[in-house]
């Protein structure tokens, strides 16, 4: 069990979708309306707005920007703790749930099939 937790916190999630900064604290993830396949991309060219916009709050935007494929979850958690202070606790639980939700939603990759 301990090995699974260590492995989980050593993972380096990576963003799968395009995104835009709204301001210094917020960003928006751009999810294709018609999927990521060739047909979806072709059809999307004929839409005035081919994306769903997923607006992230301050904490979600902080995590999203850190999911660069190079930064481990343990480093992200420590940066969150330094940036947000006690208001973010329990940081490991919150971060773990959030990145798992993002992976299930196919927003990020790199968590594999971990259950932690």
Where are these regions (language model features)?
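Hydrophobic packing positions characteristic
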Residues: 1-36
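Alpha-helical membrane-targeting segments
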Residues: 28-29, 33-53
């Amino acid at each position: 069990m301990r090995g699974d937790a260590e492995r989980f916190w050593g993972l380096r999630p990576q963003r799968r979708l395009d995104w835009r900064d709204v301001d210094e604290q917020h960003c928006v993830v751009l999810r294709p309306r018609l999927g990521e396949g060739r047909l979806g991309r072709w059809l999307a060219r004929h839409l005035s707005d081919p994306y769903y916009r997923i607006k992230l709050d301050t904490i979600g935007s902080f995590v999203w920007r850190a999911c660069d494929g190079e930064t481990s979850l343990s480093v992200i958690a420590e940066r969150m703790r330094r940036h947000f202070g006690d208001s973010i606790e329990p940081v490991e639980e919150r971060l773990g749930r959030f990145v798992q939700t993002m992976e299930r939603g196919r927003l990020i990759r790199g968590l594999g099939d971990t259950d932690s």
